[in-house]
C-alpha cells in the first residue's frame, strides 16, 4: 500500500511481464464492468499530478451538488497524467442521468482549465470534443497548434476540417 498526500489508497506495480499482461487485460475490461453499475458518463482527461488531488476534491464536491450520490469510478495511467474519469448514475436516481451531462462537463472543463489539464488525454479531440476544445484553449494555444499541424501537414490532408476550420 502506497499513500502520497492521501491521494492513493492502494497501488500495485507489476512484478513480471505476465502480471503486467494480466493488469492490462483487467484494465481493458474495467469500463465495461463499470457500466454494469449504472449509466456511465466517461471523460478521458489529463491533469498534472500536482493538481490531481485538488481537482478530485473540487470536482467531486461540485458534481455531487448536481447529482447527489453520483459514483466516481476513476482509473488511469497516472505516470503520464491520464485519467479515465468515469461517473456512474447513483442508485435510485430520479430523472434522466444523461440530461446532467452538460452541467457536469462544464464543471470538469472549467477545473481542467484552472488546473492546466486537458479535456482529452490519450484518445484525441475528434469531432465529439471539438466544441469543448475551443472553449478550453486560448486563442494563442490554438494558433500554436495550427502552426504545428501546418508544419507536419502543409497540404492539410490529415483530418481536414475535423478540428481546425
Over which residues does each language-model region extend?
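C-terminal substrate-recognition/cap domain of FAD-linked oxidoreductases
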Residues: 1-100, 104-107, 111, 115
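Short proline/glycine- and acidic-rich turn/helix-capping motifs at secondary-structure junctions
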Residues: 12-25, 120-135
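C-terminal polymerase-core module
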Residues: 34-39, 45, 128-141
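A structural signal for short, well-ordered beta-strand segments
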Residues: 43, 85-87, 123, 148, ...
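Short amphipathic alpha-helical segments
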Residues: 99, 103-107, 120, 128, ...
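Short basic/hydrophobic patches in alpha-helices and adjacent helix-turn junctions
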Residues: 107-118, 134-135, 150
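Alpha-helix capping/hinge segments and adjacent helical runs
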Residues: 113-125, 154-158
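Activity-critical C-terminal alpha-helical subdomain
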Residues: 130-165
Amino acid at each position: 500500500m502506497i499513500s502520497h498526500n492521501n491521494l492513493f489508497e492502494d497501488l500495485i506495480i507489476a512484478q513480471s511481464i505476465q502480471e503486467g499482461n494480466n493488469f492490462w487485460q483487467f484494465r481493458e475490461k474495467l469500463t465495461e464492468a463499470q457500466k454494469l453499475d449504472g449509466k456511465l458518463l466517461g471523460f478521458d482527461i489529463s491533469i498534472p499530478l500536482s493538481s490531481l488531488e485538488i481537482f478530485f476534491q473540487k470536482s467531486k464536491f461540485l458534481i455531487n451538488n448536481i447529482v447527489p450520490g453520483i459514483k466516481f469510478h476513476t482509473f488511469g495511467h497516472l505516470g503520464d497524467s491520464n485519467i479515465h474519469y468515469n461517473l456512474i448514475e447513483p442508485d435510485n436516481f430520479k430523472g434522466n442521468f444523461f440530461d446532467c451531462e452538460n452541467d457536469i462537463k462544464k464543471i470538469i472543463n472549467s477545473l481542467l482549465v484552472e488546473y492546466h489539464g486537458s479535456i482529452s488525454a490519450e484518445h484525441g479531440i475528434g469531432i465529439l470534443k471539438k466544441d469543448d476544445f475551443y472553449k478550453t484553449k486560448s486563442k494563442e494555444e490554438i494558433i500554436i497548434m495550427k502552426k504545428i499541424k501546418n508544419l507536419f501537414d502543409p497540404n492539410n490532408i490529415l483530418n481536414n476540417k475535423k478540428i481546425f476550420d
